[in-house]
């Protein structure tokens, strides 16, 4: 009887009426200081190489395929360039299929505030969660004030955000700093409350620095240091060659893509003792 009571209690705290987990497993990894590994949701309409970009397509079937791979802790759906609410639902539904190998968190990157304005961004944050996302990323945050505004969108969405001040949260809020002026404010932004992940967009930062990869790496390390000081997660892209280095440095969310993604994640898991 005691075992049945315990089991019911666990189920009631981890599963919603729709069957969607209330607390992504990656949060439990982060709580014990273990890194999580994820993959970009691939565009299912990429087309042959050399023919230029096509409109991105994301389907439930694509989500189901990702769900069956036990290596992935999370899936990162990049809608920064072209927001598509239907794509969020399609991938979320696919990730929750009965064939899924564990619960993979879905983190959605939406367009930056500067692109379509605060009202559109606020609406998209709520819409993404309503469609089944576990987390939302707001890229190109330019200042402390804009970071405060972005964090407010998660409050407006009534998301129970996991953060250093709220370890019982079940949703993920992520901010990205991608230009030198924003990175210079990393300490002040890290000191803000109400969000989960602070990351540096290393590629965008390098571009903003005129292609200076060393400068972008230095900026990335600055953001990492501030994130770790504030007990925030930091996310970064990686590959098989630098997996061990990034794990050792303390990045708790590592993201990859492409044909070599599984090999990169295997290398990362091995380095992390997973």
Model feature map: region roles:
Residues 17-274:
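Expand to "…catalyze enediolate/carbanion chemistry for C-C bond making/breaking, isomerization
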Residues 5-14:
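Bacterial N-terminal signal peptides
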Residues 1-3:
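Positively charged n-region of N-terminal signal peptides that target proteins for export
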